[in-house]
Protein backbone atom coordinates (compact mmCIF):
# COMPACT_ATOMS: atom_id res chain seq x y z
CA UNK A 1 0.00 0.00 0.00
CA UNK A 2 2.76 2.41 -1.01
CA UNK A 3 0.51 5.34 -1.83
CA UNK A 4 -1.91 5.12 1.08
CA UNK A 5 -2.16 7.24 4.22
CA UNK A 6 0.01 10.32 4.57
CA UNK A 7 1.49 10.01 1.10
CA UNK A 8 -1.96 10.01 -0.49
CA UNK A 9 -2.92 13.10 1.54
CA UNK A 10 0.17 14.83 0.13
CA UNK A 11 -1.14 14.21 -3.38
CA UNK A 12 -4.45 15.75 -2.37
CA UNK A 13 -2.72 18.79 -0.88
CA UNK A 14 -0.77 19.24 -4.09
CA UNK A 15 -4.02 19.40 -6.03
CA UNK A 16 -5.33 17.49 -9.01
CA UNK A 17 -5.15 17.86 -12.76
CA UNK A 18 -8.44 18.29 -14.62
CA UNK A 19 -8.68 17.28 -18.29
CA UNK A 20 -11.79 17.98 -20.34
CA UNK A 21 -11.39 15.56 -23.22
CA UNK A 22 -13.28 17.21 -26.07
CA UNK A 23 -13.62 16.11 -29.69
CA UNK A 24 -12.26 19.42 -30.93
CA UNK A 25 -10.27 20.79 -28.01
CA UNK A 26 -8.45 19.49 -24.95
CA UNK A 27 -8.82 21.74 -21.92
CA UNK A 28 -6.34 20.92 -19.15
CA UNK A 29 -5.19 22.57 -15.96
CA UNK A 30 -5.01 22.49 -12.20
CA UNK A 31 -7.97 21.98 -9.88
CA UNK A 32 -8.89 25.14 -8.02
CA UNK A 33 -7.93 27.44 -10.91
CA UNK A 34 -10.59 29.61 -12.57
CA UNK A 35 -9.66 28.54 -16.10
CA UNK A 36 -7.65 25.78 -17.80
CA UNK A 37 -3.93 26.40 -18.24
CA UNK A 38 -3.86 24.71 -21.65
CA UNK A 39 -6.44 24.65 -24.45
CA UNK A 40 -5.30 23.03 -27.66
CA UNK A 41 -6.83 21.21 -30.65
CA UNK A 42 -7.33 17.48 -30.16
CA UNK A 43 -5.65 16.60 -33.43
CA UNK A 44 -2.67 14.58 -34.69
CA UNK A 45 -0.71 15.44 -37.82
CA UNK A 46 1.54 13.09 -39.78
CA UNK A 47 3.71 14.11 -42.77
CA UNK A 48 1.93 13.27 -46.03
CA UNK A 49 5.12 12.22 -47.76
CA UNK A 50 8.11 10.42 -46.26
CA UNK A 51 10.52 12.57 -48.25
CA UNK A 52 9.29 15.83 -46.73
CA UNK A 53 11.47 17.29 -44.01
CA UNK A 54 9.22 19.21 -41.61
CA UNK A 55 11.19 21.35 -39.18
CA UNK A 56 13.06 18.89 -37.00
CA UNK A 57 11.53 16.01 -38.96
CA UNK A 58 9.19 14.73 -36.26
CA UNK A 59 7.04 11.76 -37.19
CA UNK A 60 3.99 13.20 -35.45
CA UNK A 61 2.66 16.65 -34.58
CA UNK A 62 0.00 17.40 -31.97
CA UNK A 63 -2.43 20.25 -31.40
CA UNK A 64 -1.52 23.74 -32.63
CA UNK A 65 1.78 22.38 -33.91
CA UNK A 66 -0.16 20.12 -36.28
CA UNK A 67 -2.51 22.89 -37.44
CA UNK A 68 0.39 25.28 -38.08
CA UNK A 69 1.80 22.76 -40.59
CA UNK A 70 -1.55 21.49 -41.86
CA UNK A 71 -0.64 22.08 -45.51
CA UNK A 72 1.95 19.28 -45.49
CA UNK A 73 0.38 17.01 -42.88
CA UNK A 74 -2.47 14.53 -42.84
CA UNK A 75 -4.68 15.54 -39.92
CA UNK A 76 -6.49 12.93 -37.85
CA UNK A 77 -8.79 13.39 -34.86
CA UNK A 78 -8.61 10.81 -32.02
CA UNK A 79 -12.26 11.40 -31.08
CA UNK A 80 -15.33 11.20 -33.27
CA UNK A 81 -18.67 12.42 -31.92
CA UNK A 82 -17.22 12.44 -28.41
CA UNK A 83 -15.97 8.83 -28.46
CA UNK A 84 -12.33 7.70 -28.84
CA UNK A 85 -11.83 5.99 -32.20
CA UNK A 86 -8.02 5.80 -32.26
CA UNK A 87 -6.46 4.83 -28.94
CA UNK A 88 -2.85 5.20 -30.05
CA UNK A 89 -3.48 8.79 -31.11
CA UNK A 90 -5.53 9.58 -28.01
CA UNK A 91 -2.80 8.28 -25.72
CA UNK A 92 -0.20 10.37 -27.55
CA UNK A 93 -2.35 13.46 -26.99
CA UNK A 94 -2.68 12.68 -23.27
CA UNK A 95 1.09 12.21 -22.92
CA UNK A 96 1.61 15.48 -24.78
CA UNK A 97 -0.76 17.18 -22.31
CA UNK A 98 1.47 16.29 -19.36
CA UNK A 99 4.86 16.58 -21.05
CA UNK A 100 4.41 19.73 -23.11
CA UNK A 101 1.26 21.62 -22.17
CA UNK A 102 1.34 21.30 -18.36
CA UNK A 103 5.01 20.29 -17.98
CA UNK A 104 4.35 18.03 -14.98
CA UNK A 105 4.92 14.38 -14.12
CA UNK A 106 1.61 12.47 -14.19
CA UNK A 107 2.66 10.26 -11.26
CA UNK A 108 2.63 13.38 -9.05
CA UNK A 109 -1.03 14.29 -9.53
CA UNK A 110 -4.50 12.76 -9.23
CA UNK A 111 -6.34 13.16 -12.55
CA UNK A 112 -10.00 14.01 -13.06
CA UNK A 113 -11.00 13.21 -16.65
CA UNK A 114 -14.27 13.99 -18.46
CA UNK A 115 -16.22 11.73 -20.79
CA UNK A 116 -19.26 11.92 -23.04
CA UNK A 117 -22.57 10.61 -21.66
CA UNK A 118 -23.00 6.87 -22.19
CA UNK A 119 -19.34 6.39 -23.09
CA UNK A 120 -18.92 2.68 -24.01
CA UNK A 121 -17.83 0.53 -21.06
CA UNK A 122 -14.74 -0.76 -22.84
CA UNK A 123 -13.62 2.82 -23.53
CA UNK A 124 -13.82 3.70 -19.83
CA UNK A 125 -11.80 0.59 -19.03
CA UNK A 126 -9.09 1.39 -21.60
CA UNK A 127 -8.88 4.93 -20.24
CA UNK A 128 -8.43 3.92 -16.60
CA UNK A 129 -5.93 1.22 -17.63
CA UNK A 130 -3.79 3.72 -19.55
CA UNK A 131 -3.71 6.29 -16.75
CA UNK A 132 -2.75 3.79 -14.06
CA UNK A 133 -0.46 1.48 -16.04
CA UNK A 134 1.21 3.83 -18.52
CA UNK A 135 1.09 7.21 -16.81
CA UNK A 136 1.29 5.80 -13.27
CA UNK A 137 -1.12 8.36 -11.78
CA UNK A 138 -1.74 7.98 -8.01
CA UNK A 139 -5.52 8.30 -8.39
CA UNK A 140 -8.09 8.86 -11.11
CA UNK A 141 -11.75 9.69 -11.65
CA UNK A 142 -13.93 10.12 -14.71
CA UNK A 143 -16.99 12.38 -14.77
CA UNK A 144 -19.75 12.86 -17.34
CA UNK A 145 -19.26 16.24 -18.99
CA UNK A 146 -22.86 17.42 -18.59
CA UNK A 147 -22.84 16.85 -14.82
CA UNK A 148 -19.69 18.95 -14.44
CA UNK A 149 -21.10 21.73 -16.65
CA UNK A 150 -24.14 21.94 -14.39
CA UNK A 151 -22.02 21.73 -11.26
CA UNK A 152 -19.82 24.55 -12.55
CA UNK A 153 -22.89 26.78 -12.75
CA UNK A 154 -23.71 26.06 -9.11
CA UNK A 155 -26.55 23.62 -9.74
CA UNK A 156 -27.08 19.89 -9.35
CA UNK A 157 -30.45 19.59 -11.14
CA UNK A 158 -31.23 20.83 -14.64
CA UNK A 159 -31.09 20.07 -18.34
CA UNK A 160 -27.71 20.51 -20.02
CA UNK A 161 -27.32 21.24 -23.72
CA UNK A 162 -23.63 20.48 -24.24
CA UNK A 163 -22.61 21.21 -27.81
CA UNK A 164 -18.95 21.06 -28.70
CA UNK A 165 -17.06 20.24 -31.87
CA UNK A 166 -18.05 16.63 -32.42
CA UNK A 167 -21.40 15.98 -30.76
CA UNK A 168 -24.34 17.64 -29.01
CA UNK A 169 -25.76 15.99 -25.91
CA UNK A 170 -29.01 16.92 -24.20
CA UNK A 171 -28.80 15.52 -20.69
CA UNK A 172 -31.25 15.58 -17.78
CA UNK A 173 -29.35 15.75 -14.49
CA UNK A 174 -31.10 15.19 -11.16
CA UNK A 175 -29.16 15.74 -7.93
CA UNK A 176 -25.85 15.37 -9.85
CA UNK A 177 -26.87 12.08 -11.54
CA UNK A 178 -27.56 11.65 -15.25
CA UNK A 179 -30.99 10.27 -16.08
CA UNK A 180 -29.76 7.90 -18.79
CA UNK A 181 -33.12 7.15 -20.42
CA UNK A 182 -33.65 10.89 -21.01
CA UNK A 183 -30.33 11.51 -22.78
CA UNK A 184 -30.50 12.66 -26.39
CA UNK A 185 -27.35 12.45 -28.50
CA UNK A 186 -27.30 14.53 -31.68
CA UNK A 187 -24.43 13.83 -34.07
CA UNK A 188 -24.47 17.45 -35.17
CA UNK A 189 -22.07 20.01 -33.68
CA UNK A 190 -19.31 22.48 -34.46
CA UNK A 191 -17.36 20.41 -36.98
CA UNK A 192 -20.52 19.69 -38.97
CA UNK A 193 -21.39 23.39 -39.04
CA UNK A 194 -17.90 24.28 -40.27
CA UNK A 195 -18.20 21.67 -43.03
CA UNK A 196 -21.65 23.03 -43.96
CA UNK A 197 -20.28 26.58 -44.11
CA UNK A 198 -17.57 25.38 -46.51
CA UNK A 199 -20.35 24.35 -48.91
CA UNK A 200 -22.36 27.54 -48.38
CA UNK A 201 -19.36 29.76 -49.11
CA UNK A 202 -19.12 28.37 -52.64
CA UNK A 203 -22.31 30.37 -53.32
CA UNK A 204 -20.18 33.50 -52.71
CA UNK A 205 -17.53 32.12 -55.08
CA UNK A 206 -15.33 31.39 -52.08
CA UNK A 207 -13.69 27.99 -52.38
CA UNK A 208 -12.07 26.89 -49.12
CA UNK A 209 -12.57 23.17 -49.55
CA UNK A 210 -9.26 21.58 -48.62
CA UNK A 211 -8.39 20.05 -45.25
CA UNK A 212 -5.94 22.89 -44.62
CA UNK A 213 -8.71 25.46 -45.28
CA UNK A 214 -10.97 23.92 -42.64
CA UNK A 215 -9.43 25.95 -39.80
CA UNK A 216 -9.94 29.17 -41.77
CA UNK A 217 -13.62 28.35 -42.27
CA UNK A 218 -13.99 27.55 -38.56
CA UNK A 219 -12.69 31.03 -37.73
CA UNK A 220 -15.14 32.58 -40.21
CA UNK A 221 -17.96 30.65 -38.52
CA UNK A 222 -16.98 31.85 -35.05
CA UNK A 223 -16.54 35.47 -36.13
CA UNK A 224 -19.43 35.98 -38.55
CA UNK A 225 -22.22 33.46 -37.96
CA UNK A 226 -25.16 34.01 -35.62
CA UNK A 227 -28.65 32.68 -35.00
CA UNK A 228 -31.61 34.66 -36.30
CA UNK A 229 -34.74 35.02 -34.20
CA UNK A 230 -36.77 35.35 -37.42
CA UNK A 231 -34.86 33.48 -40.11
CA UNK A 232 -36.82 34.75 -43.14
CA UNK A 233 -36.70 38.40 -42.08
CA UNK A 234 -32.99 38.27 -41.25
CA UNK A 235 -32.25 36.50 -44.53
CA UNK A 236 -33.77 39.43 -46.46
CA UNK A 237 -31.65 41.90 -44.49
CA UNK A 238 -28.43 40.00 -45.23
CA UNK A 239 -29.17 39.91 -48.96
CA UNK A 240 -29.22 43.71 -48.91
CA UNK A 241 -26.32 44.28 -46.50
CA UNK A 242 -23.56 41.68 -46.63
CA UNK A 243 -20.85 41.04 -44.02
CA UNK A 244 -17.20 41.57 -44.98
CA UNK A 245 -14.47 39.21 -43.78
CA UNK A 246 -10.72 39.41 -44.38
CA UNK A 247 -9.02 36.10 -45.20
CA UNK A 248 -5.46 35.21 -44.11
CA UNK A 249 -4.15 36.22 -47.56
CA UNK A 250 -5.69 39.71 -46.96
CA UNK A 251 -8.37 39.27 -49.61
CA UNK A 252 -11.86 40.32 -48.50
CA UNK A 253 -14.97 38.21 -49.03
CA UNK A 254 -18.63 39.18 -48.68
CA UNK A 255 -20.98 36.87 -46.83
CA UNK A 256 -24.76 37.12 -47.03
CA UNK A 257 -27.40 34.90 -45.47
CA UNK A 258 -24.81 32.11 -45.23
CA UNK A 259 -24.01 33.73 -41.86
CA UNK A 260 -27.36 32.59 -40.45
CA UNK A 261 -27.94 29.50 -42.60
CA UNK A 262 -24.86 27.80 -41.11
CA UNK A 263 -26.00 27.70 -37.42
CA UNK A 264 -29.64 27.29 -38.53
CA UNK A 265 -28.63 23.68 -39.15
CA UNK A 266 -28.83 23.14 -35.36
CA UNK A 267 -32.58 23.79 -35.52
CA UNK A 268 -33.25 22.49 -39.03
CA UNK A 269 -30.88 19.57 -39.81
CA UNK A 270 -32.97 18.83 -42.92
CA UNK A 271 -31.27 21.84 -44.57
CA UNK A 272 -28.40 19.45 -45.28
CA UNK A 273 -30.58 16.38 -45.72
CA UNK A 274 -30.08 15.07 -42.18
CA UNK A 275 -33.03 13.03 -40.91
CA UNK A 276 -32.65 14.03 -37.25
CA UNK A 277 -34.49 16.35 -34.87
CA UNK A 278 -33.40 19.91 -34.19
CA UNK A 279 -31.89 20.67 -30.79
CA UNK A 280 -35.07 22.42 -29.58
CA UNK A 281 -37.11 19.28 -30.32
CA UNK A 282 -34.53 17.09 -28.57
CA UNK A 283 -34.66 19.33 -25.49
CA UNK A 284 -38.45 19.01 -25.21
CA UNK A 285 -38.19 15.27 -25.92
CA UNK A 286 -35.66 14.79 -23.08
CA UNK A 287 -37.82 16.75 -20.64
CA UNK A 288 -40.86 14.64 -21.57
CA UNK A 289 -38.86 11.51 -20.71
CA UNK A 290 -38.16 12.83 -17.21
CA UNK A 291 -40.46 12.36 -14.22
CA UNK A 292 -43.53 14.59 -14.55
CA UNK A 293 -42.81 16.28 -11.21
CA UNK A 294 -39.35 17.29 -12.45
CA UNK A 295 -40.35 18.86 -15.77
CA UNK A 296 -41.22 22.34 -14.53
CA UNK A 297 -37.81 22.65 -12.86
CA UNK A 298 -36.06 21.41 -16.00
CA UNK A 299 -37.77 23.96 -18.25
CA UNK A 300 -36.54 26.66 -15.87
CA UNK A 301 -32.97 25.33 -15.73
CA UNK A 302 -31.79 24.74 -19.32
CA UNK A 303 -28.02 25.25 -19.26
CA UNK A 304 -25.96 25.85 -22.40
CA UNK A 305 -22.41 24.50 -22.48
CA UNK A 306 -19.65 24.05 -25.06
CA UNK A 307 -18.19 26.07 -27.91
CA UNK A 308 -21.10 25.54 -30.31
CA UNK A 309 -23.44 27.16 -27.78
CA UNK A 310 -21.52 30.44 -28.22
CA UNK A 311 -23.47 31.70 -31.26
CA UNK A 312 -24.96 35.13 -30.75
CA UNK A 313 -28.77 34.89 -30.51
CA UNK A 314 -28.91 31.27 -29.37
CA UNK A 315 -30.63 32.03 -26.05
CA UNK A 316 -33.45 34.00 -27.63
CA UNK A 317 -33.94 31.51 -30.44
CA UNK A 318 -34.08 28.52 -28.09
CA UNK A 319 -36.58 30.30 -25.87
CA UNK A 320 -38.82 31.00 -28.86
CA UNK A 321 -38.63 27.46 -30.28
CA UNK A 322 -39.07 25.65 -26.95
CA UNK A 323 -42.01 27.90 -26.02
CA UNK A 324 -43.74 26.74 -29.19
CA UNK A 325 -43.44 23.07 -28.17
CA UNK A 326 -43.74 23.18 -24.36
CA UNK A 327 -47.10 22.99 -22.54
CA UNK A 328 -49.01 26.32 -22.48
CA UNK A 329 -47.86 28.92 -19.91
CA UNK A 330 -44.62 27.02 -19.22
CA UNK A 331 -41.94 29.31 -17.83
CA UNK A 332 -38.70 28.76 -19.73
CA UNK A 333 -35.25 29.93 -18.69
CA UNK A 334 -32.14 29.43 -20.78
CA UNK A 335 -28.91 29.85 -18.78
CA UNK A 336 -25.92 30.83 -20.92
CA UNK A 337 -22.87 31.58 -18.74
CA UNK A 338 -20.28 33.84 -20.38
CA UNK A 339 -17.61 31.20 -19.72
CA UNK A 340 -19.73 28.31 -21.08
CA UNK A 341 -17.01 27.32 -23.55
CA UNK A 342 -15.14 26.10 -20.45
CA UNK A 343 -18.09 25.17 -18.19
CA UNK A 344 -17.19 21.49 -18.09
CA UNK A 345 -13.58 22.15 -17.11
CA UNK A 346 -14.60 24.73 -14.50
CA UNK A 347 -17.03 22.22 -12.96
CA UNK A 348 -14.22 19.67 -12.78
CA UNK A 349 -11.90 22.24 -11.21
CA UNK A 350 -14.44 22.91 -8.45
CA UNK A 351 -15.34 19.24 -7.94
CA UNK A 352 -11.74 18.04 -7.58
CA UNK A 353 -11.08 20.50 -4.75
CA UNK A 354 -14.09 19.57 -2.60
CA UNK A 355 -13.22 17.89 0.69
CA UNK A 356 -16.31 15.68 0.29
CA UNK A 357 -15.02 14.39 -3.06
CA UNK A 358 -11.60 13.21 -1.86
CA UNK A 359 -12.85 9.76 -0.81
CA UNK A 360 -14.31 9.20 -4.31
CA UNK A 361 -11.00 8.91 -6.18
CA UNK A 362 -10.02 5.52 -7.60
CA UNK A 363 -6.61 4.90 -6.02
CA UNK A 364 -3.77 2.95 -7.62
CA UNK A 365 -4.25 0.27 -4.94
CA UNK A 366 -7.92 -0.14 -5.81
CA UNK A 367 -7.01 -0.46 -9.47
CA UNK A 368 -4.38 -3.10 -8.68
CA UNK A 369 -6.89 -5.08 -6.62
CA UNK A 370 -9.95 -4.82 -8.90
CA UNK A 371 -8.61 -4.01 -12.36
CA UNK A 372 -10.45 -1.89 -14.92
CA UNK A 373 -13.89 -2.80 -13.57
CA UNK A 374 -13.32 -0.50 -10.61
CA UNK A 375 -14.24 2.44 -12.87
CA UNK A 376 -17.83 1.18 -13.15
CA UNK A 377 -18.16 0.75 -9.40
CA UNK A 378 -16.78 4.13 -8.40
CA UNK A 379 -17.58 6.41 -11.37
CA UNK A 380 -21.26 6.46 -12.26
Residue positions per predicted region:
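C-terminal region/appendage detector
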Residues: 1-380
Amino acid sequence: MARSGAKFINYMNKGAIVIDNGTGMIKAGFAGDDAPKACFPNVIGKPKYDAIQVGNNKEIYIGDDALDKKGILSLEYPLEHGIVNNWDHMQRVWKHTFDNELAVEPEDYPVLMTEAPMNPKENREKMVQFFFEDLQVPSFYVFTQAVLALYGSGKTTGLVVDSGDGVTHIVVVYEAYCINHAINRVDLAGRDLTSYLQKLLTECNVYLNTTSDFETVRKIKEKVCYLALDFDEESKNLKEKKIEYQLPDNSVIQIGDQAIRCPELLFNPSLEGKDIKGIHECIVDSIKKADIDLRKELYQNILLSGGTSMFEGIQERLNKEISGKAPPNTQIRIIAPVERKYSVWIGGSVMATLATFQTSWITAEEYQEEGENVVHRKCF
